[in-house]
Amino acid sequence: MKIGILSQFPELYSTRRLVAACESRGHEAVVINTLNCYMNINSIKPSIHYQGQELTGFDAIIPRIHASVTFYGCAVVRQFEMMGVFAANDSISIARSRDKLRALQLLSRKGIGMPITGFANKPNDIPDLINMVGGAPLVIKLLEGTQGIGVVLAETKTAAESVIEAFLGLKANIMVQEYIKESNGSDIRCFVVGDKVVASMKRQGPEGDFRSNLHLGGCGEKVKITPAERKMAVAAVKAMGLVVAGVDILRSNRGPLILEVNSAPGIEGIEQTTGISVTEPIVEYIEKMVSARKSNRAVIA
């Protein structure tokens, strides 16, 4: 097969590991900078051009769309889909997961556990908003934030009101969430491919920081997840419509709670922490899906 890896960063560990996994299974891997693609949108033969040439012959793509280029990245993935190319994560699912509010609403619709979350537009909603999620301490998040950036823990009601007022005054979109104290600055990252959790690790934030993101100096360790956590991780990915995703879970007194579903999860941290390859299962899944599509086309023909 010819597999395109949509990534702005060919030198990244994640990109290099995906290339290696494709090549080790006998496939051709081509790294494509998403932002350098340009599209011919028509009703007869939609196409994508790159570096002066039309991209042809691809069986599948693995989107690694950075959050900052979600709009254009999804457009490129959508164009590949229009060309009949299988996408490991499709454009609609990526867009769903990147909209944090929409993602939580989808999880809520499916009855999947999560921290109590509030969202508001007007400053005069603040007191009731804080009470709605259980009062202080509480977590305030920018909807556009990634990797723990734009996340604030407000220890008191006064601090919470001040932070919320400041964000709303800047016309920033925020949500507030109950603080799960018993998680103690840690979460569980589950790496899901299809309907399986292929690897999982516990992430612990630096001392004094409630955020567990490895990019912020947190550390990871291999962890055995419970059947309930495994079931919830797979259900969350399915609710988004994704195939490959990282699911962040908090362990609370009322059971596991979904914090986030990431459509382009980091690979380096979980592979180096667990010693498990997460890229091989991705390529194996693509092989299975592309083969099934070809078989279906043959039957129809």
Curated annotation (Swiss-Prot):
Co-factor: note: Binds 2 magnesium or manganese ions per subunit.
InterPro entries: ATP-grasp (IPR011761), ATP-grasp_RimK-type (IPR013651), ATP_grasp_subdomain_1 (IPR013815), RimK (IPR023533), Rimk_N (IPR041107), Rp_bS6_RimK/Lys_biosynth_LsyX (IPR004666)
Keyword ATP-binding: yes
Name of this chain's protein: Probable alpha-L-glutamate ligase 1
Ligand binding (Mn(2+) 2): E260, N262
Pfam families: RimK, Rimk_N
Positions that bind ATP: K141, E178, Y179, D187, R211, S212, N213
Binding site for Mn(2+) 1: D248, E260
Cofactor requirement: Mg(2+); Mn(2+)
Any one Gene Ontology BP term: protein modification process
Recorded GO MF terms: ATP binding; metal ion binding; ribosomal S6-glutamic acid ligase activity
Keyword annotations from UniProtKB, A to Z: ATP-binding, Ligase, Magnesium, Manganese, Metal-binding, Nucleotide-binding, Protein biosynthesis
Domain ATP-grasp, first and last residues per copy: 104-287
Positions bound to Mg(2+) 1: D248, E260
Similarity comment text for this entry: Belongs to the RimK family.
GO cellular component, one term: cytoplasm
Binding site for Mg(2+) 2: E260, N262
Enzyme Commission numbers on file: 6.3.2.-
Organism placement in taxonomy: Bacteria, Pseudomonadati, Pseudomonadota, Gammaproteobacteria, Alteromonadales
SUPFAM superfamilies in the record: Glutathione synthetase ATP-binding domain-like
